[in-house]
């Protein structure tokens, strides 16, 4: 009886340890099934996680016709038309990507999601995630982030304003706690 109890305890403990795996301790590249993700860990322990094919996130946001760097003002230059559907869809995509146990694990903490939006089409071209490497999001497997990226690219689009159409891309970010 003691042996059975011991093995049950060990199996539960092993499951607990597995669930707490930190995937993003150091800078590294993840070669997955058909995609490559890069995990950059700064000295501040901030993780930047993105598809290795991303290019825009490393390009200065600028005006197409002049090449002049774009700077957002304190008043806020409107680059995208606001609509309730797009907001609800992107929030829903993030919520759906996390399992119930993952949502419980990250409860009370927000994930920062950054997108580069095509200024001509309004489609999402690139997605990036930011979180602390000692926080709860560091225990979420790469497949969850990949699901968010592909769904945002596939299911979300915006309508750029006339000012937004002048840029090489539109930078957009938000913080969200999965519900």
What are the residue ranges of the model-derived segments?
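Charge-biased low-complexity segments
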Residues: 20-179
């Amino acid at each position: 009886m003691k042996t059975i109890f011991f093995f049950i305890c060990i199996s539960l403990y092993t499951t607990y340890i597995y669930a707490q795996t930190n995937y993003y301790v150091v800078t590294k590249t993840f070669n997955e099934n058909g995609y490559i993700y890069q995990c950059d860990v700064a000295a501040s322990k901030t993780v930047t996680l993105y598809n290795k094919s991303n290019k825009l996130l490393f390009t200065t946001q600028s005006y197409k016709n002049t090449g002049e760097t774009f700077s957002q003002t304190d008043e806020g230059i409107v680059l995208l038309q606001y609509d309730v559907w797009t907001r609800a869809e992107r929030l829903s995509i993030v919520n759906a990507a996390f399992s119930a146990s993952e949502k419980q694990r990250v409860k009370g903490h927000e994930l920062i999601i950054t997108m580069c939006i095509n200024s001509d089409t309004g489609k999402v071209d690139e997605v990036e995630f930011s979180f602390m490497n000692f926080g709860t999001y560091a225990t979420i497997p790469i497949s969850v982030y990949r699901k968010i990226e592909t769904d945002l690219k596939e299911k979300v689009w915006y309508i750029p304003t006339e000012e937004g159409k002048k840029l090489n891309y539109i930078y957009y970010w938000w913080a969200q706690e999965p519900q």
